[in-house]
């Protein structure tokens, strides 16, 4: 009876409402569109270095610094984006005398600016435009190319003012065209003390001091010193990866009124074996501000790997050339250091009439996030070298490098490395240790 009454009430209600029951409409929940606010990126670095000299010099020096960079990348709009990044380093006073006392022997200069400066500056500021397979980047930026590069071996890297165009329209091929006008020299350059033939053949020109402490100086001035302003360096490259296991690259650097440098490299990997070769040729151009340049270097490398274990051996040779700049040694004023046979600090393989060989091995403990490496390199330096003219000697360097990626802290890398040059110059030895913490975000 109760059911009958209830059905009657429902039926009456439906009739009064016109007999149609309208379903309840549930409005869909619309997720708020995420607004692209751009990206903050950077690296915080803490660096401790300790070097003890022996032989013709007896001294211990060490430094502790903190710094790095922080930057912002805008959202992309119609292919355009922009980046700005500030760089800086601050060295701590860990000795009784201050680091800014020029000529102090207690502090290592490679973590500071010129004259042990603490400094900060805008190191990157560029506009990027991407369309199709082409990318254009104009402004202050980091470069990592064979003969002009960041050389990020201490607190702050080399940075450049440049326009760079890259294109991948051709299958398996990357084309690069760049024009570089200025460089700001990173803190590593200060390890050379004063510009010299040593610095010029080790990545830092005769005018590198003009570009320290965050200053950007003309590429010609960086290479050869004051009064050698030029139109910069124009570079082009072709990188080809169309054959399985084979990677070919060819670079040409036209340093206006100084030199033209050609860099070639081939890498071939077959199963666990990798074979590589490289070649550098330099010749003077235009007003020949560096004098007659006639330099040639070549090197080969063979490596193999098995599981987490890998190793390689390399050999290089730089020819001599009478009456040429650096007697035929390779001029590398803009941080480029691609040599297979370089040490952690010793870069004598680019000296005139010098043969070098190197062996190295590493092991990855993948489960622990640890990679450990060891190496030994030897340089047979000829008498025509311009670092110690008229002297022939054998220099060597051994060392190790241990890196630990901390799993509990994303982006944190801890590093302990050391180098032990013997007869860097005849009778000059040292032991150097570095402890580095990098936090990338």
Where are these regions (language model features)?
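Extracellular loop and loop/strand-boundary signature of outer-membrane beta-barrel proteins
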Residues: 54-58, 110-113, 148-151, 221-224, ...
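Signature for the C-terminal beta-barrel architecture of outer-membrane proteins
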Residues: 132-136, 154-331, 376, 380-382, ...
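Flexible internal linker/loop segments at domain or repeat junctions
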Residues: 325-351
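Outer-membrane beta-barrel proteins
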Residues: 47-61, 65, 147-157, 282, ...
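Beta-barrel outer-membrane channel/assembly domains of diderm bacteria
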Residues: 8, 12-143, 163-169, 173, ...
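Flexible, solvent-exposed coil segments and beta strand-coil junctions
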Residues: 47-49, 104-106, 140-145, 214-217, ...
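Positively charged n-region of N-terminal signal peptides that target proteins for export
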Residues: 1-4
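Short sequence motifs at beta-strands and strand-loop junctions characteristic
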Residues: 60-64, 114-121, 155-157, 228-230, ...
